[in-house]
Amino acid sequence: RDVAVGSFLPPS
């Protein structure tokens, strides 16, 4: 799940 988010939204 986190991987998919980081794909277009880099971790703050």
UniProtKB/Swiss-Prot annotation:
<protein>
    <recommendedName>
        <fullName>Unknown protein from spot 111 of 2D-PAGE of thylakoid</fullName>
    </recommendedName>
</protein>
<keyword id="KW-0150">Chloroplast</keyword>
<keyword id="KW-0793">Thylakoid</keyword>
<keyword id="KW-0934">Plastid</keyword>
<dbReference type="GO" id="GO:0009534">
    <property type="term" value="C:chloroplast thylakoid"/>
</dbReference>
